[in-house]
Amino acid sequence: IPIAPESIKQEIHNLVIESFDLRDQSNDLIDKAQKLLYQELQLPDINDIHPKYHSENAGFRNFTVKVSNLNWRLDASYHLPNINDVIELISKNAEEVTTVGDSRISNKIILAGVFKRHYVDSKFGVPFLGGRDMMQLNPKIEKYLSKELHKDRIKKELEVFENYVLVSDRGTIGKVQIVPKHWNHWAVSQNVIKIIPKEGIAGYLYAYLSSDYALALIRREIYGSVVDMIDDNSVAVIPIPILKNKHIQETINDYVLQANEMRYQAYLKEQDAINKMNEILNN
């Protein structure tokens, strides 16, 4: 272990502590935003929802569905009674319930096409982020997508910017992330759906989609006989409540955006600490 001057060690120590403190503050703001959302909609813990089944004495879960409610879906998981309870609860105290695809909520929902990837050296490529890395603040980038060969696809389907909302569409379906500033211009896998939010609602959209209630509605849309997945159309029809109290909705939005900025500042401090350590190792 290299022994650095005390002043340098203290600088690195302070930067790491400040970085973790900012992460904690960010997480607290996200929790605060979701708590406000639950309070405004008067939502119970989702585990306290106990759906009613058709026959309680049958020995197995059973329920009926009206033909008019099939929505071209014959898979039982789409029609589970708890889903109806979730929709009823988010609707009860909302001004209205619309969908993520509503033009007031999102400008665009992008599902990239499947393509053969060409990876290159970092100076010739764009950082490429896979679905399994999307929940990390500072994912280790090992692959760079060719700028030359994938220029159009990167611009139209893969490139992300601060406050885009990402949803995993396979694997662990329904993971949600809001893009931090240091991911600007990165390319994100075609296995992640990108939502370009309308101005002034990105934070609220993230707070809602990352809730247990939204997760139930996201996973309701799963389809596939071999590989479970969702797509851009699935995300577009996910119900989302609009709050009666616009001030509360704006506050939720602001809390999340502040939290996202804190995550970025935490990243910068962490990088500063790493750079100082590298200077010690290289001298």
Task: List the predicted regions and their residue ranges.
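Basic, amphipathic alpha-helical recognition segments used for DNA target recognition
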Residues: 1, 7, 135, 140, ...
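Short, charged beta-turn/beta-strand-edge "cap" motif at the junction between a beta-strand
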Residues: 171-175
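Short, surface-exposed beta-edge/turn micro-motifs
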Residues: 123-126, 162-164, 191
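Non-catalytic DNA-recognition/assembly elements of restriction-modification systems
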Residues: 4-115, 246-283
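A generic structural signal for residues embedded in beta-strands
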Residues: 167-168
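A short, polar/charged loop-to-alpha-helix boundary motif
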Residues: 178
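Sequence-specific dsDNA recognition surfaces
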Residues: 101-117, 132-162
